[in-house]
Amino acid sequence: MVRTFAVTALALLPLVAAQQIGSTKEVHPQLTTYKCTSQGGCVKQNTSIVLDSGSHWIHAKGGEVSCTTSSGLDPALCPDKETCAENCVVEGITDYSQYGVQTRGDAMLLREYIKQNNQTKAPSPRVYLLDEDGENYSMLRLLNQEFTFDVDVSKLPCGMNGALYFSEMSASGGRSALNPAGAAYGTGYCDAQCYTNAWINGEANTAKAGLCCQEMDIWEANARANAFTPHPCNSTGLLGCAGDECNSVCDKAGCGFNPYALGARDYYGTAMTVDTTKPFTVVTQFLTADNSTTGALREIRRLYVQAGQVIQNAVVKVDGRTVNSITEPYCASQGVFEGLGGLRRMGEALGRGMVLSMSIWNDAGGFMHWLDSGNSGPCSSTEGDPSLIENKYPDTAVTFSKIRWGDLGTTFATRRLH
């Protein structure tokens, strides 16, 4: 049985001693973004970012013992979520560069590896976009809109993933009596993979439930391959699951568009149509059936801009049809996508509002083969080994910049940002 978490009800709990905010206050790096309209052009927003709560130190109140261990919550400190909230405090982060994150104006650099005390560490940061108030996540509503950003993937070798995507998290990060920190400290993460994490909406997950929500992968990529993929789920908001039901709540594989996997093997890469040795712009459009911001999502369209030239998405053949975008006919044969609501369900989430996540990571278990090896990309079966990446590419990183969204046709080509 799928269980929907009643997030708002948590605010009605008695005012027990909550997981407290520690003495080190959070300092959010500023990251300028832009909102674009047909009438006013692209206008600057004074937004910022926050690292996922998993990067924050959560420890025993009055001591230095972590509230989590390598296997999850410390049962002595966290036998239940109420006791855990009384026993634990979360500390802020004041220097994001120590976690591989640097911002400057409207650009953000994410590093996989950093040097600390002559040792290499892999913080593998994941950050979320905060609204201008710095307390809540920025909720993007993108039906009949477009989302655009510039990216430099030249330092992302095989096996790396510089990802930018949306998930249907709560705007407050699940702020409640037991989680006063909320979005300002990066709580509330969820996605369509339904992982079991130590915390759910900033509260101790002593029941070891899985947590699911709708996910729209705008960009999963390195210098050799890329994909964009909607992942619908069969309900709205945050979903709790247990056991086998965690495999049926969301479309974990999704309906993806990877040019290489679909036969366009000279389209994306070094000196190809989209040249990954140089920065470029990625545009994703969410077209609705009635061309309104409340209509049913019918198509997810992709294009690129590089060196002043607009580049249409790769044109490929699928089941005898010529396609270059994600539509219901394209997704009809892709697993459980339609059964879980397909583009309609994904569009409903985009209409309600989703949170922007950006990350860099590699894959010790599968070497990121699903993205860039075999039928999915040109990388060998061993190039994605994280130990090889660390030795050969210690400066691996991705830069996202000039993030903007708004009316169709307003975010790219000759539009000025101001």
UniProtKB/Swiss-Prot annotation:
Keyword check for Secreted: yes
Cell compartments where the protein resides: Secreted
Active site residues of this protein: 215, 220
Swiss-Prot/TrEMBL keywords: Carbohydrate metabolism, Cellulose degradation, Glycoprotein, Glycosidase, Hydrolase, Polysaccharide degradation, Secreted, Signal
Reaction(s) catalysed by this chain's protein: Endohydrolysis of (1->4)-beta-D-glucosidic linkages in cellulose, lichenin and cereal beta-D-glucans
Glycosites: 46, 118, 136, 234, 291
Single GO biological process annotation from the record: cellulose catabolic process
GO molecular function: cellulase activity
Signal peptide: 1-18
Top-level enzyme category: hydrolase
Entry annotated with the keyword Transferase: no
Highest taxon above the source species: Eukaryota
GO cellular component terms, semicolon-separated: extracellular region
Enzyme Commission designation: 3.2.1.4
Chain's role: Has endoglucanase activity on substrates containing beta-1,4 glycosidic bonds, like in carboxymethylcellulose (CMC), hydroxyethylcellulose (HEC) and beta-glucan. Involved in the degradation of complex natural cellulosic substrates.
Family: Belongs to the glycosyl hydrolase 7 (cellulase C) family.
The name this protein goes by in its record: Probable endo-beta-1,4-glucanase celB
Originating organism: Aspergillus clavatus (strain ATCC 1007 / CBS 513.65 / DSM 816 / NCTC 3887 / NRRL 1 / QM 1276 / 107)
